[in-house]
């Protein structure tokens, strides 16, 4: 079952989170890898915000109030863009986890909305895999030594 989610900035924690939208936010249970998950609050996001977004294979924590640990997706359409060509975005996100200024939250949120939620599929350990940290569960975050090539959750 595809989960309909949107990218939403949490200014209190300065992280980007995924919030369920559409049917899930209206109270229907969400089916996950560990069975049916409780529905999040309908006030998490406006019903029409990001309603065109659809992702498969979300981690269980994606449905928590804190948002997901990380999502592992790759995009054939965007993989060769300037942003991804030199692993710029993973470096940016790594700096953000360290509290360093690298990219404005507005620019980062716009990038996720424009690029990462279009034509993405979960591809396991594919060579061009990128793991984008969208907030929540920071203690599970692991990053390879600089230059940071990818993120993963422990």
Curated annotation (Swiss-Prot):
Q: How does the record describe the protein's post-translational processing? A: A fraction may be phosphorylated in insect cells and HepG2 cells, a human hepatoblastoma cell line. Phosphorylated in vitro by host protein kinase C or mitogen-activated protein kinase. N-acetylated in insect cells.
UniProt keywords (A-Z) are: Activation of host NF-kappa-B by virus, Activator, Apoptosis, Host cytoplasm, Host G2/M cell cycle arrest by virus, Host mitochondrion, Host nucleus, Host-virus interaction, Modulation of host cell cycle by virus, Transcription, Transcription regulation
Q: Does the keyword Nucleotide-binding apply?
A: no
Localisation = Host cytoplasm; Host nucleus; Host mitochondrion
Please describe what this protein does.
Multifunctional protein that plays a role in silencing host antiviral defenses and promoting viral transcription. Does not seem to be essential for HBV infection. May be directly involved in development of cirrhosis and liver cancer (hepatocellular carcinoma). Most of cytosolic activities involve modulation of cytosolic calcium. The effect on apoptosis is controversial depending on the cell types in which the studies have been conducted. May induce apoptosis by localizing in mitochondria and causing loss of mitochondrial membrane potential.
Spell out the subunit comment.
Answer: May form homodimer. May interact with host CEBPA, CFLAR, CREB1, DDB1, E4F1, HBXIP, HSPD1/HSP60, NFKBIA, POLR2E and SMAD4. Interacts with host SMC5-SMC6 complex and induces its degradation. Interacts with host TRPC4AP; leading to prevent ubiquitination of TRPC4AP. Interacts with host PLSCR1; this interaction promotes ubiquitination and degradation of HBx and impairs HBx-mediated cell proliferation.
Q: Which family does it belong to?
A: Belongs to the orthohepadnavirus protein X family.
Q: What is this protein called?
A: Protein X
Gene encoding the protein: X
